Amino acid sequence: MKKFFFVLLALLGMTVIAAEKTVYDFNLNSIDGQSTPLSTFRGKVMLLVNVASRCGYTPQYSGLEALYEKYKDRGFVIVGIPANNFGAQEPGTNQEIKTFCTAKYHVTFPMMAKVSVKGSDITPLYAFLTDRSAHPSTGGEIGWNFTKFLVGPDGRVIGRFDSAVEPDSKQLTSAVEKALANLK
């Protein structure tokens, strides 16, 4: 009977682990309007960044593109997620955002359609990312544009970097390199 109890307990524990949410449980629309399951990027190291075209941090697009180019062949992807939550700094349509990013910053990493990253209309992905109970060390409300979430190949958040952390900073590049070193 004791053996049966431990087997049952182990199976229940495995069910709880299997049911744990990851970013792969969410879908976004691409900037072109196509449904994009984040599971498309399963097995890669992913950097999710809420972006804006009229922000003091907008020049980070150049650094993000350079970071993407440097590591994309090693299993790294950046996902740009436009949001208009801070000072109305992303007022354009998805087409205007796409044109701006490609013409001015030559962005080639995946860009998603504009969403809300805070407030009553927060998109489910950002509700998940900012949930302190799910992510005690990386959760909490988004403070500004260009907040970055580093996601491991298993879909779990492994780091968060605020707007002031430049894409070419040692802090961010070291975290990306460490995550890439752990790819199977």
Language model segments and positions:
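Thiol-/selenol-based redox modules, centered on thioredoxin-like
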Residues: 124-127, 131-184
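Amphipathic alpha-helical repeat scaffolds
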Residues: 30, 50-54
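Thiol-based oxidoreductase modules, predominantly thioredoxin-like and allied folds used
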Residues: 75-92, 108-119
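Conserved helix-turn-beta segment immediately C-terminal to the redox Cys motif
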Residues: 44-45, 54, 59-81, 102-105
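N-terminal "domain-start" segment that seeds a small globular fold
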Residues: 17-39, 124
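Short, internal strand/loop/helix patches
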Residues: 23, 27, 95-145
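Sec-dependent N-terminal signal peptides
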Residues: 4-13
